[in-house]
Amino acid sequence: MNGKPYLEFREDGTFQVLHITDLQEGVHSKKDTLRLLNALLDTAKPDLVILTGDQLKGYSPAFRLLGKESVQNTLHILTEPMEKRCIPYAVTFGNHDVQCGISNEEQAAIYRSYPYCICPAEEQAAGTFYLKIRNSSGAEALRFYLIDSGNQTVHGQYAPPAPAVLDWLKEKLFQDQIPSMVFQHIPLPEYKKCRNVTLKERICSPEKNVGEFELLRDNGKIMAVFCGHDHKNDFVGQVDGIDLGYTPSGGFACYGPGAERGGRLLTFHVDRSMHYETKVLRYCDIVAPHTGNRIKEFFDTHTPTCWPGRTELIDEENLENA
């Protein structure tokens, strides 16, 4: 990969991914965000970090006032923990990144300039590509698709992935059938079909269903989709044999689940191709019981993010209303 790190299973047959999402940092990064990021890396010791969008608090006016250099500075701060530890990482984008005034394509070029960023030059939208994980013989044994799930809203609603992204995905999915996992920012509409999972906030998926889930299901080798976007959600459900999961937000410059912010560790085994294990590593468990800002933590924990502002359980009785 043009001198970039080579991704392969460890000698013990495992491969570990740390999924981080919604850091949403501005021009002055929050200390708690960096504490969590460093603790996640030291605790998980992953083979790969996947960032699934909203790395930037793009709606902050400071980015547009200060220009591209401010974006570069923030991205440098957020990627330095991986760079210092020589941990490969890959990046896709959310709905807020482009709001900083710098296009996702320009941001992707900034990321690619760092030695341990393994994002290839995209064939379609920035943030849309796949990564091969090889076994000891050099053969591809596992694949991760990173998808640009869209960053624009239409009449106040989230737009689905662009047609060109779906065409690319369809082409790649059916070239080979490799055990795979998908990472993107915005959840699929099918997340609303998950049963017996705890909702900590409303599922904010596109109103228009463009058939992405059907493509993944028809491939037959997709284990799961993991996303962010809805900062407090952290469930893993299942629809038609595909796990649909959330990772809670990892940033402290936006709303979130208080000291339960964190990242998701995923462990794969070379001899169990369609099997994985996962757990959420939380700030309160790996950094400290409370954050450095107890007032914000209180409001994060007690302010409702969906009406009627309570934890909901999706099951067969209320599925149609979810």
PLM feature spans:
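N-terminal active-site segment of His-dependent metallophosphoesterases
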Residues: 1-77
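Extended active-site neighborhood of metal-dependent phosphoesterases/phosphodiesterases
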Residues: 2-9, 66-175, 221, 264-270
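Binuclear metal-dependent phosphoesterase catalytic core
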Residues: 3-6, 11, 130-138, 212-219, ...
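Active-site-proximal beta-strand elements of phosphoester/diester hydrolases
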Residues: 14-24, 141-151, 183, 242-249
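Surface-exposed cleft-lining segments at the edges of enzyme active sites
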Residues: 24-25, 59, 64-65, 151-160, ...
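Active-site environment of divalent metal-dependent phosphoester hydrolases
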Residues: 26-28, 57-60, 91-103, 152-155, ...
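His/acidic metal-ligating clusters that form di-metal
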Residues: 44-48, 143-146, 157-234, 302, ...
